[in-house]
């Protein structure tokens, strides 16, 4: 069996050992999965695995164990591969079984040939996910993950690449591809392990730069093809996952080899139905889009490095929740003051911003998403600087965020909705392909007079559907397919927003800083990292807590609402009851209470009265209706 640390530096050797021991029993695959699961159970073990998010690809040893935190952007068609194959020694006729799992290329010695007709060959199926870094991931999240793994990754970065390092840009501009065979003199031959009729691992051209398909413009980081062998039905597009797998970056995966003979190829080119464009999309250069053969893959409940991976079950998570709930009142008070300063002294708007930040879709009743709380902050300065600075503040306390200026040009030119490209057989990403709990700030203060074209109208409609139904209708040309989402949408506007919202608060600044950018910068500078971490933990934890209402409180709320309708039948509607229930739920959670109390119900009513009174005091601002 491999040495203590060989499970990271040489995982295929571990697999080989288990395969040799257990192949006769047929349970070697389960033993491999159990082995790596056990290795990753320790508190420090996951951090000891080099992370592709932090370590440059050219510093990672090929065929070593790596991890990757990412979002599933697309799922390709399932593919067949040779899970077990038999080779024949051309000198001695000796036959040997090999495993093809966790590999793109079959390994064999120079004198060995794969027997394609062997009855002992086993054809298996695997799924390929196209994964990208979490869209809009906040810098503090990246820094926290990096600092937690950097010390332990250093030992793995001592690998010296056998080729000169090339940047992403240099890889995109490569010249004619090297088509030399991968099994030179003295090297073991490596054959592709995909079975006949399925995908080739060769693009038709090396000169065209592949589209890495990031949903948001300006995003950086690696995209990866994740080969998943078990349980792929439990994952879906837009899930955040953490993959532990074997890194495959062999140049043969992206080399053009038109002279592949029958001996060196396990694919029959005549059976290959892929178009050239599809080959480019599905088989990009491994130096740009490495492959990871998943050994263990976890779906992440959240992307907050300050929280335990799960809030259920472990003593560590129970202790964390207990400790944070003990100081939740103090943290809430400090966060309220922090956001009040960011909102120019408006404490009421800060109250609503807090409950917006911890809101989440916790269930769906038919098509209605329960728990969402889209906030429209009206009365914002028209120049857009305030909204962008507010976004920078929020980016410091939420794990993922994106700022979208709603200019006419952006609405008409940007692609919001992902669409299926049938020529390349891939899902082209759009701005609204975001992971759960992403904060999306829509800045309407920059919306000027102009004409929305057809694309612009579709984009506005998509935003409305996102806000109202928490879904995005992906474009599959011949039909639309609904993808449910869980996005916290904050709309800043001068007057009433053209988009729907669950609640609208009119901003009433209590101060007018002469230099707004300097003021916001000073606010962040004065906030200690330890305090910001408390805010981050507070927001992350409270949106994951369970909540309930007792029968007694339910009856009291019903009676109270009936009385409210009697006293003011003209202005109290069913929508008001729904909003009050949502606000009271979020107010309770923001105070660390997982059930509604009479006091919180009355507090919610008080906040709603204060919010509505602002619209009665001032009906018009700058000619726009409030």
Swiss-Prot record:
GO terms for biological process: cell division; DNA-templated DNA replication; sister chromatid cohesion. GO terms for molecular function: chromatin binding. Residues 159-187 are annotated as: Disordered. Its main location: nucleus. The keyword Cell cycle applies. It holds the Pfam family MCM_bind. One of its GO terms (cellular component) is nucleus. It is found in: Nucleus. Disulfide bonds: none annotated. Keywords: Cell cycle, Cell division, DNA replication, Mitosis, Nucleus. Belongs to the MCMBP family. Interacts with the mcm complex: associates with the mcm3-7 complex which lacks mcm2, while it does not interact with the mcm complex when mcm2 is present (mcm2-7 complex). Interacts with mcm7. Associated component of the MCM complex that acts as a regulator of DNA replication. Binds to the MCM complex during late S phase and promotes the disassembly of the MCM complex from chromatin, thereby acting as a key regulator of pre-replication complex (pre-RC) unloading from replicated DNA. Can dissociate the mcm complex without addition of ATP; probably acts by destabilizing interactions of each individual subunits of the MCM complex. May also be required for sister chromatid cohesion. This is Mini-chromosome maintenance complex-binding protein. It comes from Xenopus laevis. The gene is mcmbp.
